[in-house]
A protein has these predicted regions:
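N-terminal leader/transition segments
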Residues: 1-201, 208-212, 218-219
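Conserved beta-strand/loop scaffold segments within soluble protein domains that form the structured core
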Residues: 3-7, 11, 52, 138-319
């Protein structure tokens, strides 16, 4: 038998290593967008918050069915989708789409693909109520002091992503002692794009002592559009404040809606929140309530109507 040990031949190329997990297109977009936003951030406190949030997301990773908290919510289709920041769309078509979701008798502010749209919004607010957004330098310090103080990101990966990637903050302030009769309607509308769009709406509601207000959030989008909306809302109710909060989720049936709601109540305050989930293809609501003051209370109600392939999952924690 011939001895082949001495025969010199070029080594065979090693077979390619199998990836540990399928490529995650969404995470690639998240990472690139985080780098862009971090580089453009002008607020030192928000820059630190974004960096901390991204660190928490990287530590937790993209959720899978193997994790106890996610065993009923398969978000793999989200991970396989390549998202982009949405581009501008036709104004007439946009206005018609938004009009279908307006609520009569409310003061409406409209956000399109996560960005405030002054042309579609009310120009005057009731006395005792102010709303600013993150690009407005005025009042930014007050917003920064509260932003991220309620919404936990250490065990909630999409809350972490949303904190790292939000573009504009709807900062709602109810003045101490103010009783605002007209409901404020924040309408977040997502548009159809050639490449699925992604937006990360952020809302911060601060109700001063002995104040009272009703806040309505609506999430909707173009019919049959594929997109990701990943909102986080924080409600801070000071002593004896009363906040009635409503959320209507009426996204496209092809959309992904992964949301977080966190609230904190001070002494004698009351927050009631009512969530109605009617749209979306894959929907997840994470709710955190922290009763931080003696005699405070929170009412957490929810209703969802799904059929066919729709998935809606709600997780709640009360401390």
């Amino acid at each position: 038998m011939a001895d082949l040990s001495a025969v010199s031949a070029p080594p065979s190329p090693a077979p390619p290593a199998a990836p540990a997990s399928p490529p995650n297109a969404a995470v690639g977009f998240f990472a690139a967008d985080f780098s862009r936003l971090l580089g453009a951030e002008t607020s030192a406190s928000r820059r630190a918050l974004r960096a901390k949030a991204w660190e928490h997301f990287e530590r937790q990773g993209f959720p899978t069915l193997r994790q106890e908290e996610w065993r009923f919510t398969n978000v793999a289709p989200v991970g396989k989708t390549l998202f982009r920041r949405p581009a501008a769309v036709d104004r007439a078509q946009l206005a018609a789409g938004v009009d279908a979701f307006r609520l009569a008798g409310t003061v409406e502010l409209v956000f399109v693909d996560g960005r405030f749209d002054a042309g579609l919004s009310a120009t005057e607010l009731p006395a005792g109520l102010t709303v600013t957004h993150v690009s407005c330098p005025s009042d930014a310090s007050r917003a920064d002091a509260l932003l991220g103080s309620v919404a936990g990101i250490d065990t909630r990966p999409f809350a972490a992503v949303a904190t790292a990637l939000f573009e504009e903050l709807a900062f709602v302030e109810v003045a101490p002692g103010a009783v605002v009769d007209a409901p404020l309607h924040l309408l977040f509308y997502s548009t159809a794009q050639e490449v699925p769009g992604a937006s990360f709406p952020r809302t911060l509601i601060h109700a001063g002592e002995h104040s009272q207000a009703t806040i309505v959030e609506s999430y909707a989008g173009d019919t049959d559009a594929v997109y990701l909306t990943c909102p986080v809302t924080e409600i801070v109710a000071e002593a004896a404040a009363i906040v009635d909060h409503y959320k209507f989720q009426r996204d496209s049936r092809e959309a992904f809606h992964l949301s977080g709601l966190a609230l904190a109540t001070a002494r004698g305050s009351s927050v009631s929140t009512h969530s109605f989930s009617l749209g979306g293809g894959i929907v997840r609501h994470d709710i955190q309530a922290r009763l931080a003051g003696e005699g405070s209370e929170a009412t957490l109600n929810g209703l969802y109507l799904v059929d066919g392939r729709q998935v809606c999952d709600t997780h709640m924690r009360v401390d």
